[in-house]
């Protein structure tokens, strides 16, 4: 027996990464998992090295970031890799979620995989927000103020919770210090959840574009799919390098190169681009408490898909109606992201409210109705044949 199979530790690696049977029909959309793993490794490693030179004291936070950029050897590379790595992490994550929605990866027997994935998504957004605040530029300060103030919408105890989060009566030194501590911790929790995600996936194996269940047409992971993953890894590194070396600030906000000033409010307070769709949902609801609930519901609504999707066929590969509404949903999500960076004025307020309604309607109304209609059509087609 090969040593990789007999050794108690290497046998785990072997069963997950080498001899793991994969469907022979999976396409390049299944490579996003390996890209997300690469992004997580980049974020953790660059974050650890940056933390060696970063000071979480509010008087020194902004200056310490500039110190990393100017004085630390290759500090500029660490900072730009970390900042752009977050953007690429979310690009891959949104594409990974879209792949799951299109191919029905949330369907039984992979419900646990989907639930753990949604938890990872929530924690990744939290880590991104906490890291954005640590820079303590102008947008970081006001972003932290706005987002933490959302907890004041909780009846009776909201304001007390906000002051507890701040460690005072405004965003101050304790706020940045505890945000940095949490920002350092959360990625390791995400890494643990990624292992759980991987373990849950290993129980039933990967799904496939055809949406069929079967263990007959499978081939080993190593050799075929490892090489296939490497192709997209190199393509990813090319695009990642283009941003890091040639356009490192394109995905950032220029106001964050101004030190945080609580006395000067920016013309518009916006989070990083990857949080804009949910920020647009928050702003589309006039009531503060309902807006906060709606924003969190926009993330957690992903968990209802295993219940609302009643289709007898997994995925949208053979379903014309589902394809149409899926791409309509993607367009609507991109529209929400665009609205999130615009000023709150007509007609963007109404557009945001309509887009928010369509976002929730897709999960709660459209998916169950369309899946039921397609079930009837499948039944009619099968009877006629």
UniProtKB/Swiss-Prot annotation:
Its main location: mitochondrion. One of its GO terms (cellular component) is respiratory chain complex III. InterPro entries: Cyt_b/b6_C, Cyt_b/b6_C_sf, Cyt_b/b6_N, Cytb/b6-like_sf, Cytochrome_b, Cytochrome_b_C_euk/bac, Cytochrome_b_N_euk/bac, Di-haem_cyt_TM. Binds 2 heme b groups non-covalently. Heme b b566 binds at residues 96, 197. Heme b b562 binds at residues 82, 183. GO terms for molecular function: metal ion binding; ubiquinol-cytochrome-c reductase activity. One of its GO terms (biological process) is mitochondrial electron transport, ubiquinol to cytochrome c. Its cofactor is heme b. PANTHER family: CYTOCHROME B. Heme 1 (or BL or b562) is low-potential and absorbs at about 562 nm, and heme 2 (or BH or b566) is high-potential and absorbs at about 566 nm. Component of the ubiquinol-cytochrome c reductase complex (complex III or cytochrome b-c1 complex) that is part of the mitochondrial respiratory chain. The b-c1 complex mediates electron transfer from ubiquinol to cytochrome c. Contributes to the generation of a proton gradient across the mitochondrial membrane that is then used for ATP synthesis. Fungal cytochrome b-c1 complex contains 10 subunits; 3 respiratory subunits, 2 core proteins and 5 low-molecular weight proteins. Cytochrome b-c1 complex is a homodimer. This is Cytochrome b. It comes from Candida glabrata (strain ATCC 2001 / BCRC 20586 / JCM 3761 / NBRC 0622 / NRRL Y-65 / CBS 138). The lineage of its organism: Eukaryota, Fungi, Dikarya, Ascomycota, Saccharomycotina.
């Amino acid at each position: 027996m090969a040593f990789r199979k007999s050794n108690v530790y290497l046998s785990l690696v072997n069963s997950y990464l080498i001899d793991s049977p994969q469907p022979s029909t999976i396409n390049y959309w299944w490579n996003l998992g390996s890209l997300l793993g690469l992004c997580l490794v980049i974020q953790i490693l660059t974050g650890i090295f940056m933390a060696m030179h970063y000071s979480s004291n509010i008087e020194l936070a902004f200056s310490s970031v500039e110190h990393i950029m100017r004085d630390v050897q290759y500090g500029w590379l660490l900072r730009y890799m970390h900042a752009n790595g977050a953007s690429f992490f979310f690009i891959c994550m949104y594409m990974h979620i879209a792949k799951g929605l299109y191919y029905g990866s949330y369907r039984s027997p992979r419900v646990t995989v989907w639930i753990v994935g949604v938890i990872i998504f929530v924690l990744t957004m939290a880590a991104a927000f906490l890291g954005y605040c640590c820079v303590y530029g102008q947008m970081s300060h006001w972003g932290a103020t706005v987002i933490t103030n959302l907890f004041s919408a909780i009846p009776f105890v909201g304001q007390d919770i906000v002051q507890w989060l701040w460690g005072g009566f405004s965003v101050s030194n304790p706020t940045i210090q505890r945000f940095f501590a949490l920002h350092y911790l959360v990625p390791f929790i995400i890494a643990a959840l990624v292992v759980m995600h991987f373990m849950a996936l290993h129980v039933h194996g990967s799904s496939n574009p055809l949406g069929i269940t079967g263990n007959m047409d499978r081939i080993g992971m190593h050799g075929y799919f490892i090489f296939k993953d490497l192709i997209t890894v190199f393509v990813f590194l090319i695009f990642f390098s283009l941003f890091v070396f040639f356009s490192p600030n394109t995905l950032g906000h220029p106001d964050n190169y101004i030190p945080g000033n609580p006395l000067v409010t920016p013309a518009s307070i916006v989070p990083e681009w990857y949080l804009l769709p949910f920020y647009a949902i928050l702003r589309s609801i006039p009531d503060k408490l309902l807006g906060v609930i709606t924003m969190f519901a926009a993330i957690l609504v992903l968990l209802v898909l295993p219940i609302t999707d009643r289709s007898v066929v997994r995925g949208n590969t053979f379903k014309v109606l589902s394809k149409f509404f899926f791409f309509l949903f993607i367009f609507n999500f991109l529209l929400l992201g665009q609205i999130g960076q615009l000023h709150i004025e007509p007609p963007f307020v109404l557009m945001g409210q309509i887009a928010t309604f369509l976002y929730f309607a897709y999960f709660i109304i459209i998916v169950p109705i369309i899946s039921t209609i397609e079930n009837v059509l499948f039944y009619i087609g099968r009877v006629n044949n």
